[in-house]
């Protein structure tokens, strides 16, 4: 595995791979690698001859009250995990190389990024999309793999790629979960042992929503009421939002209609740790 820190070197390496007709896949991370990231790398390796892993803790997608300074940065451990997973190139630039002093341009992500995570974290999606665009250009990837746990982020990236006619296919990968259903996340390390036990209410609430769906309940208000009850059973849980949206446009819906994919979106603070998760809800025509 080759480790690259310089953006110009990364771009030249990617150009050389393209000239050799290598199919390139990129997996973008902020480091602190875990099983979820490894599943993205595995998916990339199944589809590409060359896999680039990027590790970059992007200052532009953290708000002033968020955890940029304390975000874990175990680069040596990450590099070892990446090597074992079969990554070909690890691109780990310093922030000043991605955002030099003269850097001025930023992506404006528009309507899809104004709600939910966008409302809770102003500027987050613009900062995220800016670095994703830059990393797509530097990696020259044919394919980019992102986790479905960050569902709104995935939707914003797909919208940007469509709008700018970027010749990279965006592939969503299923959320990887612990044995008790908690979505694997780098931020889980912030949870105390008691908070970790309580964090399972996110997955439990999604299971409750699906139970209601099987009972032919399609009223979103009633489903969310039940979801909220499950989450509220955890004494340290504070709900930021719990809502159901149409997966195609991230707009809230009142009634679930047949054969349309909806997402139950959750953002919940357990103690001081903010967790997000989502699950697909779909009513089949035969169940109506």
From Swiss-Prot:
Main location per the UniProt record: cytoplasm
EC numbers, comma separated: 6.3.2.1
Catalysed conversion reaction: (R)-pantoate + beta-alanine + ATP = (R)-pantothenate + AMP + diphosphate + H(+)
One Gene Ontology term of the molecular function aspect: pantoate-beta-alanine ligase activity
Gene Ontology CC terms, in alphabetical order: cytosol
Catalytic residues (UniProt): 37 (proton donor)
Binding site for ATP: 30-37, 147-150, 176, 184-187
Entry binding sites for (R)-pantoate: 61, 153
Pathway: Cofactor biosynthesis; (R)-pantothenate biosynthesis; (R)-pantothenate from (R)-pantoate and beta-alanine: step 1/1
Annotated beta-alanine binding sites: 61
Keywords: ATP-binding, Cytoplasm, Ligase, Nucleotide-binding, Pantothenate biosynthesis
Top-level taxon: Bacteria
InterPro entries: Cyt_trans-like, Pantoate_ligase, Pantoate_ligase_C, Rossmann-like_a/b/a_fold
Function: Catalyzes the condensation of pantoate with beta-alanine in an ATP-dependent reaction via a pantoyl-adenylate intermediate.
Additional information: The reaction proceeds by a bi uni uni bi ping pong mechanism.
UniProt record similarity statement: Belongs to the pantothenate synthetase family.
Subunit structure: Homodimer.
Name listed for the protein in its UniProt record: Pantothenate synthetase
Originating gene: panC
